[in-house]
Regions:
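Glycine-rich loop-to-alpha-helix module at the N-terminal edge of alpha/beta enzyme cores
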Residues: 20-117
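Rossmann-like NAD(P) dinucleotide-binding subdomain of oxidoreductase/dehydrogenase enzymes
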Residues: 119-264
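Short, charged helix-to-loop "capping" segments that act as catalytic/coupling loops
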Residues: 13-24, 45-60, 193, 213-215, ...
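Active-site/binding-pocket entry motifs
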Residues: 17, 113, 261-262
Length: 269
């Protein structure tokens, strides 16, 4: 971790704890800028080292051990992460607990899926008279941007698979739900080699744009709005080489009953 001596931005709760409904200060985060974003990018690139770095060349069993050790330490931070999740984005306590537990389960499921991929890759596959030995490898530097409504679960759905496959990651938490990452930073530092996990705090447009403009990002992993995805793609100078993992606006169906107020229903939908 790098010590920050610059400006900080306050983080307020969506829930007021005063009779006057004044904002409740929960903490503060560093206001990082373009220079810090490029340093994080260089750190990720150096750690990957064109696929020759310590993490991408590490044995599968060792990467799995690192991830298992990380999640075990993460589980010890359950109470504080749940409270920060609840206070910052206004999610109730039960749902906050469910999000944490679901995230832990997802990490274990990802580990098991990776074990299966590794076992299957040891076998030869035959198709049309051709025998092939196929192995999956890391892609490079991944920029991960998660949503505010599930700032832990959906963000880790991008982050964890990228890491366990041997990629290096630049990760910017969502604008809301940012403090819950703080209790986990020591675990990231402890269980992953330097430069593998790079966490940036600040405004997405300020940080993500110069990173994408560098052309050094191999994968954009984003859950959010299509406008953001399109803008980031356009800023990458090598679009044909950029891989995308996107979860954008949903098209969920809605059922409106005959006795409903149509105008009111449309507002809430």
């Amino acid at each position: 971790m790098v010590k920050w001596d610059g400006e900080f931005s306050p983080v307020y709760s969506t829930i007021s704890s005063t009779p006057e409904y004044k904002p409740t200060l929960l903490g503060e985060i560093p206001s990082l800028g373009k220079d810090e974003a490029i340093k994080a990018l260089d750190s990720a690139c150096n750690a990957f080292d064109k696929g020759k770095g310590l993490w991408p060349t590490m044995k599968v069993v060792d990467r799995i051990n690192a991830m298992e050790n990380f999640v075990e330490e993460m589980k010890q931070k359950r109470d504080v992460v749940v409270k920060l999740l609840m206070w910052e984005i206004g999610k109730n306590h039960t749902d906050s607990q469910k999000e944490f537990d679901r995230t832990v389960d997802y990490i274990y499921d990802t580990i098991e899926a990776y074990k299966k991929i590794d076992r299957d890759s040891a076998k030869f596959q035959k198709h049309s008279g051709i025998n092939a030995h196929i192995r999956r490898g890391p892609l490079g530097v991944v920029l991960c941007l998660g949503p505010y409504n599930y700032p832990l679960n959906e963000t880790f759905c991008l982050l964890i698979p990228a890491l366990i496959m041997g990629n290096t990651v630049i990760f910017k938490p969502a604008k809301h739900g940012v403090l819950l990452i703080s209790p986990l930073m020591e675990a990231f530092k402890k269980h992953f080699p330097p430069g593998v996990v790079n966490i940036l705090f600040g405004r997405g447009r300020v940080l993500a744009t110069p990173i994408m403009e560098s052309g050094k990002v191999n994968v954009l992993a984003l859950i959010g709005h299509s406008t953001s995805a399109n803008s980031l793609q356009e800023s990458h100078p090598k679009k044909n080489r950029l891989r995308l993992v996107l979860g954008l606006e949903a098209k969920n169906p809605a059922i409106i009953l005959p006795d409903a107020d149509l105008d009111l229903s449309l507002i809430h939908i």
